From Swiss-Prot:
GO terms classed as biological process: proteolysis
CDD domains linked: MPN_DUF2466
Sequence similarity: Belongs to the UPF0758 family.
Motif (JAMM motif): 173-186
PANTHER family: DNA REPAIR PROTEIN RADC (PTHR30471), UPF0758 PROTEIN YEES-RELATED (PTHR30471:SF3)
Descriptive protein name: UPF0758 protein Sama_0327
Domain of life: Bacteria
Amino acid sequence: MAIRDWPEGEGPREKLLQRGAAHLSDAELLAVLLRNGVSGQNAVDLARELIGEFGGLRPLFSATKQQVCRLQGLGPVKYAQLQASAELARRLAGESLQRGAVLTSPDLTRDYLRFQLADRAYEVFAVLLLDSQHRVIQFVELFRGTIDAASVYPRELVSLVLEKRAAAVIVCHNHPSGVAEPSQADRRITERLKNALATIDVSLLDHMVVGDREIVSFAERGWIG
């Protein structure tokens, strides 16, 4: 049944306007973003199918274009709508660590990195640049793709740190497998970066590896030293 044929006030947009977004289900909120359905499905039914197909909102919003567009009736426009919404949500979360914000606890950093990096279908290597008071200067994605000792160039990090005049950094990356346990390659990369930063008197405070349910801190394991 088309949403326009539903009882008055039961459509997701009308319900949102009358009762507030908190009263909508995940599928109803997603339907508002999608705006319309596809042949044979209204927007709410389509939203339910998408959430079920991908196993939740996080994997859906981090899915690739190919993964989304392989579903019948979906194309680049729907994918663009999902990506725009996900990026807005990331930027909103990022406001908690805007320039000048102080990292008061590891949990704050974990929450931010979890939202930025968890459930991505590809690896992202990034850095949090901090001043001498551990206030945030900037969060920068250095590159995307398979991360190994050959693909991480210490000179690029050093150049960025000098450009932004950072006094300390936290590096981080995700494991698309969902398992956060660091590899030996991760430990070797960390040692190389720490040594490179030491040549310009900048501290590597931590390397955090983001998985689906856990974020491993090198500092907490005593691996930074």
